[in-house]
Amino acid sequence: MLRIAILGRPNVGKSSLFNRMCKRSLAIVNSQEGTTRDRLYGEIRGWGIPVQVIDTGGVDKDSEDHFQKHIYKQALAGANEADILLLVIDIRCGITELDAEIAKQLLYLKKPLILVANKADTLKDEYRVHELYKIGISEIVTVSASHDKHIDKLIHKIKTLANVPEVVEEPREEMHEEEVPGMEFPETKEFLSDDEDEDTAFSQSSVADKPLKIALIGRPNVGKSSIINALLNEERCIIDNVPGTTRDNIDILYSHNDRSYLFIDTAGLRKMKSVKNSIEWISSSRTEKAIARADICLLVIDATHHLSSYDKRILSLISKQKKPHIILVNKWDLIEGVRMEHYIRDLRATDMYIGQSKILCISAATKRNLRQIFSSIDELHTTVSSKVPTPVVNKTLALALQKHHPQVINGRRLRVYYAIHKTATPFQFLLFINAKSLLTKHYECYLKNTLKSAFNLYGVPFDLEFKEKTKRTN
């Protein structure tokens, strides 16, 4: 894999260049200095080889900013792991003392280095290129990331230095979701219409060879980045005790037991009244987008604090988007005199959505139960990727109906003729009944809880669809 690191002092347009190269808005772009704090990873496609772009935070070694030592460490780590380095400057400012200091350190690494003179929006700006050679870097390209100007020249220069052959990307065939065959039972046709059958009803949206996208969601300062760093045994995300340290959604690809995981570390959701600037607002909205993008969500809460209304709000967002999820109760090492099973029992009683969730008590600091995260993710993914056999669904419901008979309404009783596991995304069962008017909310909840317990659907938001049907006569 070819790795390209983008480096430079604050506010020279590194994130704008990163987004142009990756052709998507991954990094938060704003005129405020220090917007990017962690290393961000993006992917370039169509080069014929895997290419990864690393966006680093703005380097300012002399700054008294509380985060600068962390940002500098992250930027240096990005430079060390990269094959090609891009030093970005603001051509309108010329070569500053800090630019020269950064260039000196990068030249010391003896790696291919390109000086990217950004914000060359006019011809007058481009004419200043001759002033830049005094920095000691022979490869110089002028660009305007915000106007998508000369990005192609920069790409060509990178390919030349990396000996990447030019390839013509063939048009990709449009992908369609594969239908997962259902099990055939002769009696099924009594309830399914001519344009409706089990084979076409059930489908999976997941693709086996793609990494599982795992979003870590939670309020600021609950330990999301600490969990990722503990899992990966590497400091990839800046950690501090000041709430809101992570602002960008950070994509981190990781392999464990021959399975790939793409962890999305998100900025913490905040109360809207505390969102004081556009950066915080963008970060909050990105958290919601990360939920939509994820295959599985990990909601991180703090064991030392009571469950807040915003923890419940986040869980509500996850559940409404029908995302499989696990609640990670972090900082369990700080809890004394409480049995774990009692804590989980009491936690389930605090909220409807939590009562339906899978819960793990962990500690990023001591690494307690961290490996259970992977096994729980795999178990949850297997559940939502597998079809529940139709005979099993029907036997489970038959036993439930036998155990608790539906109540009689106007001389009639609810009858469930047949049921199938209809779809995986969202997870849904289809039940054929005699009349919806005979289905009470209480009995619907009873059937749903029965299926949840029988098929271990804790952490899997699912629906029951009811369809009125009478047996077909020939």
UniProtKB/Swiss-Prot annotation:
Acetylation listed as a keyword:
no
Q: Which residue range or ranges hold the KH-like domain?
A: 386-470
- In this chain the EngA-type G domain maps to 2-166, 212-385
Alphabetized, the UniProt keywords read:
GTP-binding, Nucleotide-binding, Repeat, Ribosome biogenesis
Enumerate the Gene3D superfamilies for this protein.
Answer: 3.30.300.20, P-loop containing nucleotide triphosphate hydrolases
According to the UniProt entry, the coiled-coil residues are none
Q: What are this entry's molecular-function GO terms?
A: GTP binding; ribosome binding
Per UniProt, subunit arrangement is:
Associates with the 50S ribosomal subunit.
UniProt-recorded name of the protein: GTPase Der
Q: What gene is this protein a product of?
A: der
